[in-house]
Amino acid sequence: WPGPLTMVVKKKPGMPDATTGGLDTVGIRLPDTQIARELIEAAGCPIAAPSANISGRPSPTKAQHVIDDLSGKIDAIVKGDDCRVGIESTVLDVTGDTPVILRPGIITAEQIEAVLDKKVEIDPAVLKQSTDGSLKPKAPGMKYKHYAPKADMVVIEGQRDKVKKEIERLKGLNEQLGNKVG
């Protein structure tokens, strides 16, 4: 740490509910990118910020993704390098005796166990879905739709040259209709 690990801890008294969604816990993350660290340092205080995407949409890995999702809804974008990985941070609840992964990410349970020298559990809502709603994800980004891009998908099968021609035909058609292609 710093890096793609968010730790859920008990919030301190006086911390505004707006930063915790009214919960008695708060997620703390210290980014490892230089531009994010410089922004935090320049602010001179902790920064409470959501992900730079519309809820339920895939997380952005490039500034252009943020522009595509939030253009006209935000005042500015601090543009840095593209993300090194397209996976969210691992969310680890450390409020109890046993750390619990609430959202898997690039940092694995095994890596955390090696550092902490203790067993880490994975939240049951991560491992299976319940039809009765009894298992609810405790971390953002764990909904099925979160990882589904908003796009139509067409499967084209067959001989390579025919597949290529059909892709080119569909591309041209969609461009004529004003649809985003690429």
Predicted regions and their residues:
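Active-site-adjacent structural elements in enzyme catalytic cores
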Residues: 1-182
